[in-house]
Amino acid sequence: MYAIIPQQIPQDRRAEINEKILFAIDSGKDLVPKESIYNCYTGIGGLHNLRQADFTSYHEYAEAKKEFEMGQFFTPHDICRSMVETLSPTSAEMVLDMCCGMGNFFNHLPNLHNAYGFDIDGKAVAVARYLYSEAHICLLYTS
């Protein structure tokens, strides 16, 4: 579906790029090519600007990071492709990604009409729905 184009997005530009992508999606216009969104959206994982040296232990650092990121980690595109190729789902099989984020796995599925996903991050869900409009993607509310 979308080509994997390796990106080196500087840490200090990720939040800005994410905001521009979300603005483009919200505008309802094709301001940014979908392939660019697929390759450039980073979510909140890695945006924390925390330094391990500022904490007394790795555990404190990891807990602070987890609180900020909500445990978010986007599986790299190549790994998603390899996993889907290994599983080799048919176009008739239903596939569920219970923590779909921006939907990286959906990019490699044979039939998006049989793809289901949910996530707790509304921004990531908005990106996934935009990129994979045929898939069934829901926002899971948490308290």
Regions found by a protein language model. Give the residues of each.
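Short, conserved SAM-binding/catalytic segment
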Residues: A128-A135
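Conserved small/polar residues in nucleotide/adenosyl-binding loops
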Residues: Y141-T142
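Class I S-adenosyl-L-methionine
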Residues: Y2-V127
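Hydrophobic/aromatic anchor residues within beta-strands of the central parallel beta-sheet
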Residues: A115, A135-I137
